C-alpha cells in the first residue's frame, strides 16, 4: 500500500504543476501606448510600454517583435515581393512619400538600453537581446520610442488616403507569436493572418480635432484642448487594435439585446427597406448559437474588410446600369434585405472567427476559412433554404424571353455555389491543397476556392454523422479559442476522418469520372464508372 504522505506529495506536485502551467498560459502581454497623429506629414509619434511574461517552460534571453508597418519601406521586403507575385504594380511605381516605415529610436528595459536589430531578410521583425535570462512566468517591461510613417491606403486599404482618412490595423510594434517553444517570425504579406495572442491595451491618442475616431477598443475618456482631441481607450483580450480617423462619421452604433455593441460602416441601401438592427441581431444571435458568443463587448464591422474579401459574385448580381441620362436598368436579383444580410454575414463571421481564434493563421488558415464557409452554409440552410444562387436572374427577360431558365445553373441553390466554384477550379486544374501554407496559395485559392472546399467538407462530415457531434466539437474548439488542436479534436477513436484530413485537405486529388453502360432492372441498377485514364 502506498505511503499516504508520498501520495499527498505526488498529488500536490501534480496540482502545482498544473496550476503553474495554467498560469503561464493565462499570462497576457499588455501594451501601454501614447500616440500622436500628424496627418499632414502622415506620421505617428509613439511612446510604448510592452509588459511581457515568458510563456515558455524554459528561460528566454531573446525576444522578437513584429513591426508590420516597416514592411512598406521599400521594394525589397517580403511584402513587396508578395505584391509582385500578385501582379500588383502600384507599390513599385509609387513615390517614396507614399511608402511606410518605422524609425525605432530607443528600446529600454527598466534599467538599461537594449541591444536590438532588424532581421536582414525580414525588416518587419526586430530581435531584442535581453541583458539577462527571463525565467518561466517572469515578467519584463520594454519601453519603446518610435515614429511611424503611414503608408498610402491604396496598397492594402490600411493606411492614409488622399482625403486624409486613416485606417490602422497591425500598426503598432507587438511581440511576435510564441508557440510550442518557438518564435513564429512571420512577415507582413497582406494576408490578414496576424497570429498573435489576445492582449490587453491601454492607449491614448492625440489627433487633430477635424477627425472622428472609431475603434474596436472601449473608449474611456475624450476631451479637446487647443484644436487637439485626446481620446483614451482601454480593453482586454484583443487580438488587434483597429482605429479609423475620418473627417466624416460614417459609423453607426447599434446596441444589442445581449448587452454588446456593434459599430459598423457596412450599411444597407439608404432606401430604408432594411431593418438594420433586426438584421444585425439575427446574425449575431445565430453566431452565438452556432459557435460561442463574441469574446469582446464591442464589435467593429468594417466596410473596408468586406471590400477586401467580398462574397464572390454577389455584387455582380445586384446593380443598376445607367442606359441613358434619365433611365437606369434594374439588375437587382436579390432583395435589399438578403443582399445586405449576406454582406453582413460575410464580414461578421470573418471578424468573429479571426478575433476568437489565437492560432497560427498562416499555417492553419484552412481552419479559419472552413469555419467561415461552414457558418454561412448553415445560416442559409436555416433562414433561406429555398434561395437560388442566381436569385431572380433566371426569371430575367430579354426580348420577353427567359433565356437562363432552362439551364441547370438556374436551378442551383445558393449553397450549391460553394461546391460549384471549387469544382470549376478543379476542372481548370488550378486547385491547390488546402493544407498548404497561406503564402503558397494563389489569391483565388486563398480567398475563395480553398475556404469553400473546406467548408463544404465540414458540412459533409456533419451530414454523414447525422447528429450534433460536429457542431458540439466546433463549439468546444471555439470556446477554447483555438488552444485545442483542431485536427486532434476531431480525430477520435470513434470517428474515422482520415479521408478528410489526409485526402480531402492534404492531397486534394481531383478525379474526372464518367458513368457509362447504365442498366436498370426490377431489383438493381448496374453501371460502370470510368476515370480519365480509362480504368474502371
Each language-model region and where it sits:
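Amphipathic alpha-helical substructures
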Residues: 436-522
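N-terminal, polar/Ser/Thr-rich
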Residues: 24-45, 57-59, 497-499, 503
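Juxtacatalytic substrate-recognition/specificity segment
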Residues: 203, 253-365, 371-375
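Ligand-binding face of N-terminal immunoglobulin V-set domains in extracellular IgSF glycoproteins
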Residues: 44-71, 75-76, 85-89
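Acidic/His/Gly-enriched intrinsically disordered linker/tail segments
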Residues: 363, 369-456
